[in-house]
Amino acid sequence: FVSYKDDKPVFVCEKGIIQEQRFMKEYSANDYNHCFYIDHGSDCLIVTEAIVDMMSIMELTEDFKRYNYLSINSVTKYQAIFEHLKNDTKIKSVLMRVDHDKAGIRLNEKVCLKLKKQFPHVRINIEYPPKEKDWNDYLVYEVNKKEKVDAYTIVF
């Protein structure tokens, strides 16, 4: 995955897709004030922990281009949220869509406190996946649920 700023790559992340052999590589030259960012010119920013969760939310969202997206790639690299708010004054709301675990809950607490102090005009919304720990697992759950229903559907 490559994220660009002013037509230059500023954040590169490699990620494996085989669950039994977890692989992820980030590069030392990555700009963690930018992270992996997709700008659709929206006033609403969706923040995720992982790029795959970002893509899952895009798939689950009816019109994914209504939002900007930021994957911080770790609960420790949340500074990028504030950098994007500082550099893009049209953003009016932040939708926190991180993992539903202790680290994700703590991240939301930290970010909300800091956002309220530094950007009091920005609305904050926190939502966790209704089922499963993260948004990619939730997408898989929804697809499997639909396929199970489709498998029992009889077409006349």
Where are these regions (language model features)?
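TOPRIM fold recognition
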Residues: S42-D43, E59-F156
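Phosphate-handling DNA/RNA-contact segment within nucleic-acid enzymes
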Residues: F1-N87
